[in-house]
Amino acid sequence: MTTLSHAAVGLLVTKFFVDRGWLPDATITPYILGVAFANIPDIDGLVSLRRVYDHHSALKNLSHYPANWFIVFGFVALLAIPFHIRYFYTYLGLATVNVFLHFILDTFSIYHGIAWFGPWNKKKYSFIRMLPIIPSDTHEWVHWYMKHWVLYLEIALWIVTLMVLLEHWI
């Protein structure tokens, strides 16, 4: 899935948290953080801007191993205990849910998928693998992606997100 789809899911999850009163609704901050949390596993894309179609290999998949994020979030939670930061654990929950959903979306990748049991087992899982190989460049990735039905799934996700948020803000 693409950054826009991860962002859409981040917005929907944040709206869920806000609607339940778990996060403040008088500010845009939760939504900005929700989008950031939903895209944080793709931090490796910043390291490999020239090869964004194959960004998972930039950090040797470290940011795309679910176990690594549970370790990071657990460590951050322990460090935060003495500070009693308001909404901290709610935002940590938002981050955890968004990162997990990021991996679910990436399991719908048109090639390789996610190494759910990494770093111990590097076998990648994809529900709908279409490409047997990694594209040679971003242009080739876009070419294949435009032909795949996942594109329409993403467009539907964007439309639903816009409808839900517009209903919320209008």
Where are the language model's segments positioned?
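N-terminal membrane-targeting hydrophobic helices
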Residues: M1-I170
